[in-house]
Amino acid sequence: MHRVYCADILLKSESPMNDFASMFEKATGHKRPHDYQSRLACGERQDKPEAEWFCGGTDCASRLISVPTGMGKTAAVTLAWLWNRVALGNGKWPRRLVYCLPMRTLVEQTRDEIQGWLQKLAEAYPDNEDLQRLAAHSPIILMGGVENDDLRREWDVYPEKPAILIGTQDMLLSRALNRGYGMSRARWPMHFALLNNDCLWVMDEVQLMGAGVGTAAQLEAFRNEFKTFPSCLSGLPSTTWYLSATANLDRLKTREWRNKERHATFIFELSADEKKTAVVCAKKTLDLRPNKKMEDCVGEIIQRHDALAAGKPLCSSLVICNTVKRAVALYNAIVNELTDKENKPQVLLLHSRFRRYERREQRNNLGKPIPPAGRIIVATQVIEAGVDISNAILWTEVA
């Protein structure tokens, strides 16, 4: 039996959401999105009243999104897609959101965030059929060693339904190249078709991806040249969003793009006013300790943390070491120093050599509420790329 489907260019939403700001608040709990998040979902404000701006949508076009770390890029792209495709029912936006990441840790973190947003939105808008399906059947995880449950495993049997896929670059890009890792050869063409048609590709943390960035850019160019679905009907180009706090346009100038100009709004960044806000211009006190090893600072690390925790409970300190060996040694030294202390902070160790169940346990510990005495996290550079952790004090080795 052949399953045939067709995309309407304009869809009808059964339960229209009031406005983007309202949807954003219900999903994330934040009362108001950043202006750049609203621009990504609703387009440029220009002279529109705010209420009218929040009720509108925008076109879906490829972008290089350059926004500082910690300003909610994951929420921005996910909710922009949900707003335009699901809330407004705009069939010109792709049916599937494909979220590609360079590290397993980031896949797990992104999965938890998006899953939480979908559940909250499904509760807030129970009459929206697409949203209810997304909450039950998405996100689908494509990552080595991960099995999806029964509701998510057969996502490729329903190409007419909206879906959110999250995975590592090896699993996603190999499928887009018709050489899917970890799957039967007989199913390669199916995933090849589904991931090259009707998809908004999001390449997050591209500075960590290596050859994956060029591969994604080449695939974007090929999809434009051969007119994949729905661009073959609508005339709109294939869409890929490249996300990074340290964006580099030169990395996207692959062979197929060398003699082509990107559209005028391809580079998407904070406006001049947004760059002056407190969240971007926050003052940071820097203190350099030359000729001093991290192991010699154990007492000071604990002392500084305790002093801060006394005036600001539930705070966290982060210590970054250059090697796993140093991180383990420093962790043991801090734990030994705190042995006889009564009201002591929680101490966690994070590095890349943990086994899977240990990583899961550490991730769960990070997600738990901070104890009254605070938390000290000792980590390697595994913590630096996109991991969502807020800390009051940062100690780091510079050499």
Where are the regions that the model predicts?
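N-terminal helicase ATP-binding lobe
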Residues: 1-399
